Each structure stands twice: as C-alpha cells, then as structure tokens.
Amino acid sequence: GRAAVSTWNGDVWLVSGIDEDLDRLEWRRFATGLFDPLGLRIVDDVVYVHGRDGLTRLIDINGDGEADCYENFNNQVYITPAFHEFAFDLQTDDEGNFYFTKGAPVNPGGRGFMKIVPHHGTILKVSKDGSTIETIATGMRAPNGLGVSPTGIITSGDNEGTYMPRCRLNWIEEPGYYAGVKDTAHRAPVPDQPALARCWMPMEVDNSSGGQVWVTGKGWPDLQGRLLHNSYGTCSTYLVLPERV
C-alpha cells in the first residue's frame, strides 16, 4: 500500500511498500514549502493539505511522483503571527465538504492569549468546491484533531490550559457549539455555560488530545461503527463508550 504524510516543517511525503512487515518502505518528497501543514486528506486520488494559510490542492501534472501545481483551494481563513494558532487536521463528510480546526493564540508560557481573530479556537467547514468557509464550533483552546462520522457527527479534542481544566472530547451534532474558552467564543453575549463535553480525561489518560476515527472498515469487525480517540500526549488510542440517558 501507499500513504501520504505531511510534516510541520512544510513537506508532504509519499510512502510506498506498506505491508505487514514494513521492512522495505520507500519515501519520496511530493511537495515542499507549505505553511505548517498539520492536516492532509486524499480525495479522488488528489492530495489536499491544510496549512495555516488555508487549503492547498497538490497536483502531479506529468506523473513523475512530485507535485507540479500547488493550487489555492481556499484561503479565507484568518492568520496572524501567533505561534500557537496551529492548523489542525483535515477531514471530509459524505457530501465532500472539508473540516479542520484552528488553535487559539496561546501566549508563550501557556497562560492567556495574544490578539484574537475570528477563526481562533474554532472548527471550520469549507465547501466541496472550496468557495465558502463557515464556523461550526467556537470556544476552543487547542483542538488538536477531529473526526467526522458517517452520519455527520463532528468530534474534536481540546488541550488543557486557560479555561480548559483537562482535555475534553467535544461531540457536535449541529452548528453553534461552544466549548467554554471565553476569549474564543466569537459571539455576544458569551454563553454562561459551555456545551457538555462527551467526557473529560485525566492527565494520565490524555494530556494533549489528538483526533478521532470512526471505524468503518472490515478489518476490526468487533469495533465496527465505534469511535476511537487518539492522544498525542500519551501516544495512545482509546475506545469511546458513549451512552445516552
């Protein structure tokens, strides 16, 4: 098999030779010079990358294994010099719309925030054709990853810090979700209470949340349709056990 991997340093690599043994992997740089690309999605065999300056479509015109065209797919996202406004993840729904998250501009040292702009601490949606962008959820600190279910439920983690006592798992079924960070609420008045988290995670379980994955393939039949949560901080994967009461 093959995979595409983006790095914070600005590269996209194609990895071939993926099998059970993983003893003959070949890496080839497909693209370079991107702006902190922490999200990547392959749609119809075309690589889309999410960087701090928006979404880029990478096209290999002559078939030599390297991107020749770096197409500006959507650049409507706000950007600032803040080091912490990370551009996290890139997912799609069944209709082809794109979803990603934008970190809040945490001050060096971790307490408080630098200048806030409208897309800080949010989950954003870009239309299938790249023409529009809209905010789905606000009030986040560092939503390092998300997931989109086959039925359209959006999930995300968030990392502990200012206004975020522990890492939480957000469960978003409709636009307007507010996770609790007042500086990134982007609405007036600011809600008195945040939306309920699906769960809060102790530090020893997760001290820096990653994204989520809905199991849809046949490789793990016992987990079919279930949600997995990934922890960046503890390098772990957890099975989420939701219960509606």
What is each stretch, according to the model?
Residues G1-V245:
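Beta-propeller domains with acidic blade repeats across secreted/periplasmic ectodomains
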